[in-house]
């Protein structure tokens, strides 16, 4: 028999029953968490406020409270980063969800303007059927920015800018090595984004 806990969302559960990680101990972030069951080691399922998409959320990150969703569910911004700022390499994700948007070239042009340069998008193999993903990179002395455009056949899309930054104490070579490792984690999060239809599936 069920004890009732399985039917509760993390935001409704007793804090003592939640995983002892930033994603659930932060009051704002846990509102986005779909379940206390890991989707893979170190990652939990997040569902957006628009119910437009899910993703695998890193357990040691928190969502910025400037994130918001429009009441009509056509737009959402989702911003998250590591809770601990005193680490060697830090990520900040800025995700914009839009629906409906059918003109992908318009989206790329808009992202070029945001980046302040012409982005060289490259296709990646998508995990989910009828979804598409292209990414580009911007590199400067201390920051690697990964840019992703993800969309599907139902005119849903996310535009993502993720900065991977090294702390000032890290030298150039070590920074590049750390950013390479972090790049793989970031791309895995990109690929985990799954669009939902109006029935939440």
Predicted regions and their residues:
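Secretory pathway targeting signatures of secreted, lumenal, and periplasmic proteins
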Residues: 44-106
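N-terminal targeting sequences that direct proteins away from the cytosol to non-cytosolic compartments
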Residues: 1-72, 169-201
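Short Gly/Thr-rich strand-loop-strand
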Residues: 115-137
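Short small/polar-residue motifs
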Residues: 29-31, 58-64, 76-77, 115-122, ...
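Short, exposed beta-strand/loop patches in secreted or surface proteins that constitute
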Residues: 36, 46, 70-71, 80-81, ...
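Short, well-structured beta-strand
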Residues: 129-201
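Extended hydrophobic/Leu-rich segments
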Residues: 28, 98-101, 124
